[in-house]
Amino acid sequence: IALLSCAHGGGKPAFNFNAAVPEGWKTIDSEDPMLFMTKDGGYKQFVLIRERSLAEPFQFTQRSMRKGMLPEEAADIIVNEILSDTNVRNFSLLEKTSARIAGHSGFRLTFIYTDADGFNFKTLYYGFINGDSFYNIRYAATQEDYFQQDLKTFEKVFESFTLGTAKAS
């Protein structure tokens, strides 16, 4: 497992967190402030860690989060955003509960859905607000066997997640 420290600057929003990239997994570059990693490709399994500004509205609902928002309220915004996404079909929320993420109060969602290409995903979605940012850590995999096969690997990534102190460059 390699520890990846992410700090980003320039014209894009800065983000700052650390997470372990499992051995045998690769990261995929993105213009967005996020870390995307997969072992067998995004249509098999992936882990996505993202930081977004609280001021940035979500794409489909145009709703934003705010400082002091309860984790349950933030979770509801995420569920409504997913339900509004035209690329998501057959969405079913299996669980919505409180969670601790790197020492922060947040939430965990477990859900299944079909994407626009017909792939069925099962997802664990963790989220929390810290300062002016919303952080989410998502694990998704197609088919139950892929989900179970890499669940322990995701748990190691999740446990390795910390907010960093690196300066944007």
Regions found by a protein language model. Name each.
Residues 60-69, 96-98, 143-148:
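Second-shell loop/turn segments in exported
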Residues 22-25, 134-169:
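Surface-exposed amphipathic alpha-helical segments
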Residues 18-73:
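Secretory pathway targeting signatures of secreted, lumenal, and periplasmic proteins
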